[in-house]
């Protein structure tokens, strides 16, 4: 019931944001505060909460654990100044959500819609569990502007810094390649991925991972190697949109627009190959996050008489996905909601 009320309030806030420029700023501020408080004041929420809490309690300079250095030393600093684990959760919630908000403000043609997608497509809730990775992605996304400006050294340094929180962020180094506008190249990549939706290539990929690899344990864990039915269901709409944009590719005439289109096509191809296998899906997060920028961009480009139909169909898809993943499946332990305020 909490998350039903939550998404209802979000809808009201974001709809009111359409009415007036001042109301837009106020609504977005309220939205940001609300998502920070819900994420930051959570308690025992998410499948990894207890694990991260145990790591935090036992973390010391003598026991540095297996964590990436960025996340490790930030937490050591928090412990040094006497912060509880719950306080660290709140601080990371601020950092993650503010950085995602700034990213959306910079690149989205409709900030309210992108924020709604941030929730409905589960990225907000994913950050309850994959804390390190989502902090890294949030930092990385705010450095993409340097790739647009061809300041590749700065882009490289920010990517490396982001990867100090989760090494999978290094795959984001591919982003500058997506500035190459070759329709046929992306079409071939996408078409080549289609057979993997039904072919069991995922198990072969997992078995090729060497045991010496730092994250090899993730590729042998049942949880990470099982197929997510929600992720498979989610393949339908993105693949339909790839067909649509490959036909209308010429309307995306700006450099930033083409980059987000290209990243989206690549992320869909990656998702097709992953076919819902959790560990492979996580590798795709750094690309797949592009969809919260991409969908509003596409809606803004289609013809006026088609816009209401496409918009309502997308809204229905996003709501169904939210209901299925959060309200029904619990989004990996975020349901029911518990807060440190009610201990």
Where do the PLM segments sit?
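Transmembrane-helix motifs of polytopic, lipid-linked glycan transferases
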Residues: 91-107
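Transmembrane-helix signature of polytopic, membrane-embedded enzymes
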Residues: 104-121
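Membrane-interfacial loop-to-transmembrane alpha-helix junctions, especially the N-terminal start
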Residues: 24-28, 253-264, 306-314
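Membrane-interface transmembrane helices that cradle and orient dolichyl/undecaprenyl
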Residues: 140-153
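Alpha-helical transmembrane segments and terminal signal-anchor/GPI-anchor hydrophobic tails
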Residues: 45, 50-54, 65, 72, ...
């Amino acid at each position: 019931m909490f998350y039903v009320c939550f998404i209802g309030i979000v809808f009201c806030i974001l709809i009111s944001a359409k009415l007036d420029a001042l109301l837009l700023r106020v609504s977005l501020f309220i939205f940001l505060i609300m998502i920070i408080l819900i994420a930051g004041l959570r308690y025992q929420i998410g499948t990894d909460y207890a694990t991260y809490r145990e790591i935090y309690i036992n973390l010391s300079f003598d026991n540095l654990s297996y964590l990436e250095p960025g996340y490790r030393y930030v937490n050591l600093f928090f412990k040094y100044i006497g912060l509880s684990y719950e306080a660290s959760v709140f601080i990371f919630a601020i950092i993650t959500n503010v950085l995602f908000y700034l990213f959306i403000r910079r690149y989205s043609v409709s900030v309210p819609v992108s924020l709604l997608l941030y929730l409905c497509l589960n990225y907000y809730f994913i950050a309850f569990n994959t804390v390190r990775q989502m902090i890294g992605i949030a930092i990385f996304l705010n450095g993409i502007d340097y790739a647009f400006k061809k300041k590749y050294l700065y882009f490289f340094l920010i990517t490396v810094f982001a990867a100090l929180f989760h090494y999978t962020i290094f795959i984001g180094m591919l982003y500058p390649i997506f500035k190459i506008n070759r329709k046929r190249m992306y079409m071939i990549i996408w078409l080549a991925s289609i057979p993997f939706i039904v072919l069991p290539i995922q198990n072969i990929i997992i078995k090729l991972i060497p045991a010496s690899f730092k994250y090899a344990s993730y590729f042998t864990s049942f949880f990470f190697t099982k197929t997510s039915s929600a992720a498979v269901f989610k393949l339908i709409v993105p693949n339909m949109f790839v067909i649509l944009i490959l036909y209308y590719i010429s309307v995306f005439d700006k450099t930033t627009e083409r980059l987000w289109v290209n990243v989206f096509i690549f992320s869909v191809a990656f998702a097709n190959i992953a076919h819902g296998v959790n560990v492979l899906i996580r590798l795709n997060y750094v690309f797949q996050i592009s969809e919260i920028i991409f969908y509003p961009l596409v809606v803004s480009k289609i013809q006026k008489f088609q816009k209401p139909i496409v918009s309502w169909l997308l809204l229905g898809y996003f709501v169904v996905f939210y209901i299925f993943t959060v309200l029904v499946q619990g989004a990996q332990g975020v349901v029911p909601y518990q807060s440190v305020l009610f201990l």
